[in-house]
Protein backbone atom coordinates (compact mmCIF):
# COMPACT_ATOMS: atom_id res chain seq x y z
CA UNK A 1 0.00 0.00 0.00
CA UNK A 2 2.89 2.27 0.85
CA UNK A 3 4.26 1.76 -2.67
CA UNK A 4 0.92 2.55 -4.31
CA UNK A 5 0.62 6.04 -2.75
CA UNK A 6 3.91 7.39 -4.18
CA UNK A 7 3.00 5.97 -7.58
CA UNK A 8 -0.36 7.75 -7.55
CA UNK A 9 1.41 10.96 -6.51
CA UNK A 10 3.81 10.74 -9.45
CA UNK A 11 0.94 10.17 -11.88
CA UNK A 12 -0.93 13.22 -10.53
CA UNK A 13 2.18 15.43 -10.82
CA UNK A 14 2.71 14.34 -14.43
CA UNK A 15 -0.88 15.15 -15.33
CA UNK A 16 -0.58 18.56 -13.69
CA UNK A 17 2.55 19.34 -15.72
CA UNK A 18 0.81 18.41 -18.94
CA UNK A 19 -2.12 20.72 -18.17
CA UNK A 20 0.25 23.59 -17.31
CA UNK A 21 2.16 23.15 -20.56
CA UNK A 22 -1.06 23.12 -22.53
CA UNK A 23 -2.20 26.30 -20.77
CA UNK A 24 1.10 27.99 -21.62
CA UNK A 25 0.74 26.99 -25.28
CA UNK A 26 -2.80 28.34 -25.28
CA UNK A 27 -1.60 31.64 -23.75
CA UNK A 28 1.15 32.00 -26.38
CA UNK A 29 -1.33 31.28 -29.15
CA UNK A 30 -3.76 33.80 -27.71
CA UNK A 31 -1.04 36.45 -27.47
CA UNK A 32 -0.02 35.81 -31.08
CA UNK A 33 -3.62 36.06 -32.21
CA UNK A 34 -4.02 39.30 -30.30
CA UNK A 35 -0.88 40.70 -31.91
CA UNK A 36 -2.15 39.72 -35.34
CA UNK A 37 -5.49 41.37 -34.62
CA UNK A 38 -3.69 44.56 -33.51
CA UNK A 39 -1.65 44.65 -36.74
CA UNK A 40 -4.67 44.02 -38.95
CA UNK A 41 -6.28 47.46 -38.47
CA UNK A 42 -2.93 49.12 -39.21
CA UNK A 43 -2.62 47.12 -42.42
CA UNK A 44 -6.22 47.92 -43.32
CA UNK A 45 -5.63 51.60 -42.58
CA UNK A 46 -2.46 51.59 -44.71
CA UNK A 47 -4.28 49.90 -47.59
CA UNK A 48 -7.16 52.35 -47.24
CA UNK A 49 -4.75 55.30 -47.17
CA UNK A 50 -2.98 54.08 -50.32
CA UNK A 51 -6.33 53.66 -52.05
CA UNK A 52 -7.37 57.16 -51.02
CA UNK A 53 -4.09 58.59 -52.34
CA UNK A 54 -4.63 56.81 -55.65
CA UNK A 55 -8.18 58.15 -55.85
CA UNK A 56 -7.03 61.64 -54.79
CA UNK A 57 -4.54 61.81 -57.66
CA UNK A 58 -7.46 62.10 -60.09
CA UNK A 59 -9.67 64.22 -57.84
CA UNK A 60 -10.23 67.79 -59.03
CA UNK A 61 -10.22 70.37 -56.27
CA UNK A 62 -12.47 73.43 -56.23
CA UNK A 63 -10.95 76.46 -57.94
CA UNK A 64 -10.22 79.52 -55.81
CA UNK A 65 -10.30 82.65 -57.97
CA UNK A 66 -11.14 86.30 -57.26
CA UNK A 67 -12.17 85.44 -53.71
CA UNK A 68 -14.75 82.88 -54.88
CA UNK A 69 -14.86 79.09 -55.00
CA UNK A 70 -15.80 77.32 -58.24
CA UNK A 71 -16.73 73.66 -57.83
CA UNK A 72 -15.56 71.01 -60.34
CA UNK A 73 -17.93 70.45 -63.23
CA UNK A 74 -19.53 73.90 -62.97
CA UNK A 75 -19.70 77.19 -64.88
CA UNK A 76 -19.59 80.45 -62.95
CA UNK A 77 -19.59 84.16 -63.74
CA UNK A 78 -17.20 85.89 -61.35
CA UNK A 79 -16.44 89.59 -61.09
CA UNK A 80 -13.11 91.37 -61.19
CA UNK A 81 -13.13 94.90 -59.76
CA UNK A 82 -10.05 96.79 -60.99
CA UNK A 83 -11.63 100.26 -60.99
CA UNK A 84 -9.51 102.55 -58.84
CA UNK A 85 -11.54 105.72 -59.34
CA UNK A 86 -14.67 105.56 -57.16
CA UNK A 87 -15.00 102.28 -55.29
CA UNK A 88 -18.57 103.03 -54.29
CA UNK A 89 -19.71 103.16 -57.93
CA UNK A 90 -17.10 100.87 -59.49
CA UNK A 91 -18.40 98.50 -62.17
CA UNK A 92 -16.97 94.98 -61.89
CA UNK A 93 -15.71 93.24 -65.02
CA UNK A 94 -17.33 89.84 -65.72
CA UNK A 95 -15.00 86.83 -65.72
CA UNK A 96 -16.37 83.56 -67.13
CA UNK A 97 -15.03 80.33 -65.61
CA UNK A 98 -15.59 76.74 -66.76
CA UNK A 99 -14.00 74.40 -64.18
CA UNK A 100 -13.84 70.82 -65.44
CA UNK A 101 -14.51 67.50 -63.74
CA UNK A 102 -11.16 66.08 -64.80
CA UNK A 103 -7.62 67.34 -64.07
CA UNK A 104 -5.95 69.41 -66.78
CA UNK A 105 -4.29 72.75 -67.55
CA UNK A 106 -5.69 76.22 -66.96
CA UNK A 107 -6.22 78.31 -70.08
CA UNK A 108 -6.85 82.06 -69.91
CA UNK A 109 -8.55 83.98 -72.73
CA UNK A 110 -8.43 87.78 -72.67
CA UNK A 111 -10.23 90.10 -75.10
CA UNK A 112 -10.74 93.85 -75.55
CA UNK A 113 -7.50 94.89 -73.90
CA UNK A 114 -8.10 97.57 -76.51
CA UNK A 115 -11.70 98.65 -76.02
CA UNK A 116 -12.59 99.01 -79.71
CA UNK A 117 -11.57 95.45 -80.66
CA UNK A 118 -14.86 93.58 -80.71
CA UNK A 119 -14.18 90.29 -82.50
CA UNK A 120 -12.37 88.80 -79.51
CA UNK A 121 -15.30 89.58 -77.21
CA UNK A 122 -17.59 87.49 -79.39
CA UNK A 123 -15.01 84.69 -79.66
CA UNK A 124 -14.83 84.39 -75.88
CA UNK A 125 -18.62 84.45 -75.53
CA UNK A 126 -19.20 81.75 -78.14
CA UNK A 127 -16.48 79.44 -76.87
CA UNK A 128 -17.25 79.77 -73.15
CA UNK A 129 -20.97 79.14 -73.52
CA UNK A 130 -20.50 76.07 -75.69
CA UNK A 131 -18.27 74.37 -73.09
CA UNK A 132 -19.67 71.56 -70.94
CA UNK A 133 -17.75 71.68 -67.63
CA UNK A 134 -18.77 68.12 -66.79
CA UNK A 135 -16.90 66.97 -69.92
CA UNK A 136 -13.94 69.33 -69.52
CA UNK A 137 -10.43 68.41 -68.34
CA UNK A 138 -8.88 71.47 -66.72
CA UNK A 139 -10.17 75.03 -66.53
CA UNK A 140 -10.94 77.79 -69.03
CA UNK A 141 -11.02 81.37 -67.72
CA UNK A 142 -12.43 83.97 -70.11
CA UNK A 143 -12.24 87.75 -69.63
CA UNK A 144 -14.36 89.08 -72.53
CA UNK A 145 -13.87 92.82 -71.86
CA UNK A 146 -10.61 93.68 -70.10
CA UNK A 147 -10.70 97.40 -70.93
CA UNK A 148 -14.27 98.20 -69.92
CA UNK A 149 -13.46 101.90 -69.90
CA UNK A 150 -12.35 101.92 -73.54
CA UNK A 151 -15.17 99.57 -74.55
CA UNK A 152 -17.81 101.96 -73.24
CA UNK A 153 -16.22 104.84 -75.14
CA UNK A 154 -15.61 102.87 -78.35
CA UNK A 155 -11.91 103.62 -77.93
CA UNK A 156 -8.71 101.62 -78.17
CA UNK A 157 -7.37 103.47 -75.13
CA UNK A 158 -8.26 104.08 -71.52
CA UNK A 159 -10.00 107.36 -70.76
CA UNK A 160 -6.62 108.98 -69.99
CA UNK A 161 -5.46 108.05 -73.53
CA UNK A 162 -3.03 105.40 -72.34
CA UNK A 163 -2.64 102.10 -74.19
CA UNK A 164 -3.20 99.37 -71.60
CA UNK A 165 -1.15 96.87 -73.61
CA UNK A 166 2.02 98.85 -72.91
CA UNK A 167 1.89 98.61 -69.09
CA UNK A 168 2.05 94.92 -68.13
CA UNK A 169 2.79 93.43 -65.66
CA UNK A 170 1.93 96.74 -64.05
CA UNK A 171 2.46 98.07 -60.57
CA UNK A 172 0.04 98.45 -57.66
CA UNK A 173 1.18 102.05 -57.02
CA UNK A 174 1.62 103.16 -60.62
CA UNK A 175 -0.62 105.09 -63.00
CA UNK A 176 -4.23 104.07 -63.60
CA UNK A 177 -3.15 101.92 -66.57
CA UNK A 178 -0.34 100.33 -64.56
CA UNK A 179 -2.66 99.54 -61.64
CA UNK A 180 -5.26 97.99 -63.92
CA UNK A 181 -2.57 95.89 -65.62
CA UNK A 182 -1.21 94.80 -62.22
CA UNK A 183 -4.66 93.75 -61.03
CA UNK A 184 -5.47 91.69 -64.14
CA UNK A 185 -2.07 90.06 -64.28
CA UNK A 186 -1.86 89.05 -60.62
CA UNK A 187 -5.48 88.17 -59.91
CA UNK A 188 -6.24 86.25 -63.10
CA UNK A 189 -3.44 85.66 -65.61
CA UNK A 190 -0.85 84.39 -63.12
CA UNK A 191 -3.29 81.69 -61.99
CA UNK A 192 -3.14 80.03 -65.43
CA UNK A 193 -0.75 77.87 -67.46
CA UNK A 194 -1.56 79.21 -70.93
CA UNK A 195 -2.72 82.56 -72.29
CA UNK A 196 -4.35 83.56 -75.58
CA UNK A 197 -4.73 87.35 -75.85
CA UNK A 198 -7.31 88.24 -78.53
CA UNK A 199 -6.89 91.36 -80.68
CA UNK A 200 -7.80 92.93 -84.03
CA UNK A 201 -6.05 95.40 -86.29
CA UNK A 202 -6.00 99.06 -85.30
CA UNK A 203 -6.01 102.50 -86.89
CA UNK A 204 -8.25 101.51 -89.85
CA UNK A 205 -6.29 98.33 -90.54
CA UNK A 206 -7.47 94.74 -90.71
CA UNK A 207 -5.58 91.51 -90.08
CA UNK A 208 -5.84 88.05 -91.57
CA UNK A 209 -6.63 85.69 -88.64
CA UNK A 210 -3.21 84.85 -87.27
CA UNK A 211 -1.18 84.03 -84.19
CA UNK A 212 1.59 86.36 -83.05
CA UNK A 213 4.18 84.20 -81.31
CA UNK A 214 7.83 84.32 -80.31
CA UNK A 215 9.06 81.41 -82.41
CA UNK A 216 12.51 81.60 -80.85
CA UNK A 217 11.02 79.79 -77.83
CA UNK A 218 10.42 76.08 -78.30
CA UNK A 219 7.54 75.88 -75.81
CA UNK A 220 5.75 78.67 -77.70
CA UNK A 221 6.35 76.89 -81.01
CA UNK A 222 4.79 73.71 -79.58
CA UNK A 223 1.80 75.67 -78.26
CA UNK A 224 1.25 77.53 -81.55
CA UNK A 225 1.00 74.20 -83.40
CA UNK A 226 -2.19 73.37 -81.45
CA UNK A 227 -4.38 75.93 -83.27
CA UNK A 228 -5.02 73.90 -86.41
CA UNK A 229 -4.55 75.69 -89.72
CA UNK A 230 -4.28 79.23 -88.34
CA UNK A 231 -1.44 81.31 -89.77
CA UNK A 232 1.50 81.92 -87.40
CA UNK A 233 3.64 85.06 -87.55
CA UNK A 234 6.95 85.25 -85.71
CA UNK A 235 6.62 88.33 -83.51
CA UNK A 236 8.62 88.78 -80.30
CA UNK A 237 6.41 90.89 -77.99
CA UNK A 238 7.27 94.47 -77.16
CA UNK A 239 7.87 95.80 -73.68
CA UNK A 240 4.73 96.22 -71.63
CA UNK A 241 2.57 93.84 -73.67
CA UNK A 242 0.48 91.30 -71.80
CA UNK A 243 2.02 88.49 -73.84
CA UNK A 244 5.53 89.59 -72.89
CA UNK A 245 4.72 89.73 -69.17
CA UNK A 246 3.11 86.28 -69.30
CA UNK A 247 6.11 84.67 -70.99
CA UNK A 248 8.44 86.29 -68.43
CA UNK A 249 6.32 84.67 -65.72
CA UNK A 250 6.63 81.22 -67.35
CA UNK A 251 3.12 81.26 -68.83
CA UNK A 252 3.08 80.07 -72.45
CA UNK A 253 1.36 82.85 -74.37
CA UNK A 254 0.39 83.93 -77.88
CA UNK A 255 -1.68 86.76 -79.36
CA UNK A 256 -4.49 86.00 -81.80
CA UNK A 257 -5.28 88.74 -84.32
CA UNK A 258 -8.43 88.67 -86.46
CA UNK A 259 -10.16 91.41 -88.43
CA UNK A 260 -10.39 95.11 -87.66
CA UNK A 261 -11.59 97.44 -84.89
CA UNK A 262 -15.08 98.80 -84.20
CA UNK A 263 -16.81 96.03 -86.11
CA UNK A 264 -18.05 92.48 -85.64
CA UNK A 265 -16.87 90.25 -88.48
CA UNK A 266 -18.62 86.91 -88.40
CA UNK A 267 -16.12 85.16 -90.66
CA UNK A 268 -13.15 86.25 -88.54
CA UNK A 269 -14.98 85.26 -85.35
CA UNK A 270 -15.84 81.80 -86.73
CA UNK A 271 -12.23 81.29 -87.75
CA UNK A 272 -10.97 82.28 -84.31
CA UNK A 273 -13.46 80.08 -82.45
CA UNK A 274 -12.50 77.11 -84.62
CA UNK A 275 -8.84 77.68 -83.76
CA UNK A 276 -9.63 77.87 -80.03
CA UNK A 277 -11.74 74.71 -80.20
CA UNK A 278 -8.85 72.94 -81.90
CA UNK A 279 -6.52 74.20 -79.16
CA UNK A 280 -8.70 72.68 -76.43
CA UNK A 281 -8.79 69.38 -78.26
CA UNK A 282 -5.02 69.29 -78.82
CA UNK A 283 -4.41 70.11 -75.14
CA UNK A 284 -6.66 67.12 -74.26
CA UNK A 285 -9.01 69.43 -72.40
CA UNK A 286 -12.03 68.05 -74.21
CA UNK A 287 -12.81 65.31 -76.68
CA UNK A 288 -12.27 66.16 -80.31
CA UNK A 289 -15.51 67.03 -82.07
CA UNK A 290 -13.82 67.83 -85.38
CA UNK A 291 -10.28 67.85 -86.66
CA UNK A 292 -8.77 70.86 -88.40
CA UNK A 293 -6.22 69.20 -90.61
CA UNK A 294 -5.31 72.14 -92.84
CA UNK A 295 -1.58 72.92 -93.16
CA UNK A 296 -0.43 75.73 -90.87
CA UNK A 297 1.36 78.56 -92.71
CA UNK A 298 4.28 80.00 -90.73
CA UNK A 299 5.84 83.39 -91.45
CA UNK A 300 9.15 84.08 -89.78
CA UNK A 301 9.63 87.42 -91.52
CA UNK A 302 7.14 90.15 -92.34
CA UNK A 303 7.31 93.79 -93.38
CA UNK A 304 4.93 96.72 -93.65
CA UNK A 305 5.00 98.23 -97.15
CA UNK A 306 4.41 101.98 -97.02
CA UNK A 307 2.80 104.57 -99.25
CA UNK A 308 5.24 106.68 -101.25
CA UNK A 309 2.95 109.72 -101.35
CA UNK A 310 -0.20 111.08 -99.78
CA UNK A 311 -3.63 110.68 -101.33
CA UNK A 312 -6.49 108.21 -101.67
CA UNK A 313 -5.47 104.57 -101.13
CA UNK A 314 -7.27 102.01 -103.31
CA UNK A 315 -6.21 98.38 -102.89
CA UNK A 316 -5.91 95.78 -105.61
CA UNK A 317 -5.31 92.84 -103.26
CA UNK A 318 -7.20 91.28 -100.37
CA UNK A 319 -6.22 89.70 -97.08
CA UNK A 320 -4.50 86.31 -97.42
CA UNK A 321 -3.70 86.84 -101.11
CA UNK A 322 -0.45 85.34 -102.36
CA UNK A 323 1.56 88.05 -104.10
CA UNK A 324 4.64 88.02 -106.31
CA UNK A 325 7.60 90.34 -106.25
CA UNK A 326 6.79 93.40 -108.38
CA UNK A 327 3.02 92.93 -108.14
CA UNK A 328 0.91 96.05 -107.55
CA UNK A 329 -0.71 95.93 -104.10
CA UNK A 330 -2.59 99.21 -104.43
CA UNK A 331 -2.37 102.78 -105.66
CA UNK A 332 -2.33 106.15 -103.94
CA UNK A 333 -3.78 109.03 -105.97
CA UNK A 334 -3.72 112.77 -105.27
CA UNK A 335 -7.41 113.81 -105.42
CA UNK A 336 -6.59 117.26 -106.84
CA UNK A 337 -3.79 116.72 -109.35
CA UNK A 338 -4.82 113.13 -110.19
CA UNK A 339 -1.17 112.05 -109.99
CA UNK A 340 -0.64 108.67 -108.42
CA UNK A 341 1.90 106.06 -107.48
CA UNK A 342 1.71 102.31 -107.06
CA UNK A 343 2.65 100.36 -103.94
CA UNK A 344 4.71 97.37 -105.09
CA UNK A 345 5.37 94.02 -103.39
CA UNK A 346 9.14 93.84 -102.71
CA UNK A 347 9.19 90.02 -102.58
CA UNK A 348 6.98 86.95 -102.87
CA UNK A 349 4.69 86.53 -99.89
CA UNK A 350 1.21 86.71 -98.47
CA UNK A 351 -0.94 89.65 -97.36
CA UNK A 352 -1.25 89.25 -93.58
CA UNK A 353 -2.54 92.73 -92.81
CA UNK A 354 -3.64 95.80 -94.73
CA UNK A 355 -5.22 99.21 -94.43
CA UNK A 356 -8.78 99.72 -95.56
CA UNK A 357 -9.29 102.15 -98.44
CA UNK A 358 -8.84 105.65 -97.02
CA UNK A 359 -6.92 108.90 -97.26
CA UNK A 360 -3.28 108.32 -96.31
CA UNK A 361 -0.10 110.34 -95.88
CA UNK A 362 3.32 109.55 -97.31
CA UNK A 363 4.95 106.79 -95.27
CA UNK A 364 1.64 105.27 -94.17
CA UNK A 365 1.94 101.51 -93.46
CA UNK A 366 -0.48 100.03 -95.98
CA UNK A 367 0.26 96.30 -96.42
CA UNK A 368 1.93 93.72 -94.21
CA UNK A 369 3.55 91.03 -96.34
CA UNK A 370 4.70 87.78 -94.74
CA UNK A 371 7.50 85.56 -96.01
CA UNK A 372 6.59 81.91 -95.44
CA UNK A 373 8.82 79.30 -93.75
CA UNK A 374 8.31 75.57 -93.28
CA UNK A 375 7.43 74.12 -89.87
CA UNK A 376 10.75 72.25 -89.87
CA UNK A 377 12.69 75.50 -90.33
CA UNK A 378 10.81 77.14 -87.47
CA UNK A 379 11.34 74.23 -85.05
CA UNK A 380 15.02 74.00 -85.95
CA UNK A 381 15.49 77.71 -85.32
CA UNK A 382 13.70 77.53 -81.96
CA UNK A 383 15.76 74.53 -80.84
CA UNK A 384 18.96 76.26 -81.94
CA UNK A 385 17.98 79.39 -80.04
CA UNK A 386 17.27 77.43 -76.84
CA UNK A 387 20.50 75.45 -77.15
CA UNK A 388 22.54 78.60 -77.75
CA UNK A 389 21.18 80.11 -74.56
CA UNK A 390 22.01 76.96 -72.59
CA UNK A 391 25.50 76.72 -74.08
CA UNK A 392 26.19 80.27 -72.97
CA UNK A 393 25.00 79.54 -69.46
CA UNK A 394 21.99 81.80 -69.76
CA UNK A 395 19.46 81.52 -66.96
CA UNK A 396 16.33 83.67 -67.04
CA UNK A 397 16.21 86.14 -64.20
CA UNK A 398 13.14 87.23 -62.31
CA UNK A 399 11.82 90.43 -63.89
CA UNK A 400 12.72 93.39 -61.75
CA UNK A 401 9.77 95.08 -60.09
CA UNK A 402 9.18 98.60 -61.36
CA UNK A 403 10.52 101.24 -59.02
CA UNK A 404 7.72 102.62 -56.95
CA UNK A 405 8.76 106.22 -57.38
CA UNK A 406 8.95 105.81 -61.17
CA UNK A 407 5.55 104.15 -61.38
CA UNK A 408 3.95 106.73 -59.13
CA UNK A 409 5.48 109.68 -60.96
CA UNK A 410 4.73 111.16 -64.36
CA UNK A 411 7.75 109.48 -65.94
CA UNK A 412 7.89 109.45 -69.76
CA UNK A 413 6.85 105.79 -70.03
CA UNK A 414 3.65 106.63 -68.19
CA UNK A 415 2.64 109.09 -70.89
CA UNK A 416 0.36 107.84 -73.63
CA UNK A 417 2.72 105.92 -75.93
CA UNK A 418 1.53 106.08 -79.52
CA UNK A 419 1.55 102.58 -81.04
CA UNK A 420 3.98 102.09 -83.92
CA UNK A 421 2.32 102.13 -87.32
CA UNK A 422 3.68 98.68 -88.14
CA UNK A 423 2.47 97.03 -84.93
CA UNK A 424 -1.21 96.69 -84.12
CA UNK A 425 -1.04 94.41 -81.08
Question: What are these regions, as identified by a protein language model?
Answer:
Residues 1-23:
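Sec-dependent N-terminal signal peptides
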Residues 22-425:
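Structured catalytic-domain cores with a bias toward divalent-metal coordination
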